[in-house]
Amino acid sequence: MGEKSTGPNPTDRSKSGTKRSLLVDGQGMPIGITIDGANRHDMKMTRATLQNIVIHRPLPSSSLKLQQHICLDKGYDYPEVYELLEEYGYTLHICKRGVEYNNGNKKKRRRRTPKYRARRWVVERTHSWMNRFRRLLIRWEKKEDNYIAILHFVCTWITYKRGGVFG
């Protein structure tokens, strides 16, 4: 079906699939995106996603005002990811693999794990916004460049609608 950015998806009876790795800001605005085959592990797409940031990123600083945080899930809990994010100057918030957290009272959970308040729902919401576009939900494009162009158009549309700059 596609070029190198598709691969067999084991949960979909070996049909080709595409995985989107998305980096968003705190409001859900997309700032970096990359694609690969559906059978590719998330951790291996981290560097490409960080390299595809399309806006000018201020240099990280020791002051609290310029620190840049990144929230990831347990799928990124590998030493290579820690080193990469340290190289890029991010303050990492990640849940450790094999550690269960209290799913009950939110106040109690925050008190127990103050540095693990990863807000993954922001990224999931942006993926949901992207899935409103049928062209992305069902991949019809055979060429990777065409699919990436549509992804960038959708990211621009989301930024336009969420930004409120033009009314």
Feature-to-residue mapping (PLM):
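Charged phosphate-binding loop/patch that engages nucleotide di/tri-phosphates or the phosphate backbone
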Residues: I150-G167
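Helix-centered, glycine/charged polyanion-binding patches within enzymatic domains
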Residues: P58-K143
